[in-house]
A protein has these predicted regions:
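Long, low-complexity or tandemly repetitive, helically biased scaffold regions used
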Residues: 2, 11, 17-115
């Protein structure tokens, strides 16, 4: 049993070493996503208010030829919003799984504290 226990501990230690920096990276990514929200709101407001008139101004040749205009692509903003939404959906699904895991951990912690 001792060899089995040692192997189990080594395996769990390797998991801990693997997961710890990934959690830190995810925290940084999540912080960036929170900051991106404000920019996405600005882009959403632009898309619903001024985008169409800017698009037609470009179509009519009223904008400088050297102006960067990726934002005026018909699907550029929509596709970006869809990707952002999909990330949010994935985060919600992951959040639900994490909450379930947390409940299990809390139950186990209570049981282990009784020993």
């Amino acid at each position: 049993m001792t060899d089995e226990r040692v192997e189990r501990i080594k395996k769990m230690e390797a998991k801990l070493d693997d997961v710890t920096p990934k959690i830190k990276n995810f925290e940084e990514s999540l912080s960036n996503m929170k900051k991106v929200f404000d920019d996405m709101k600005v882009l959403s407001d632009y898309y619903s208010k001024d985008w169409k008139s800017d698009y037609f101004a470009d179509e009519e040749g009223k904008l400088p030829k050297n102006l960067k205009r990726g934002v005026l692509g018909q699907d550029t903003l929509y596709d970006l919003f869809q990707r952002y939404y999909d990330i949010g959906k994935d985060m919600k699904e992951l959040s639900d799984k994490i909450k379930t895991l947390k409940k299990k951990i809390l139950i186990n912690k209570k049981i282990n504290n009784l020993l």
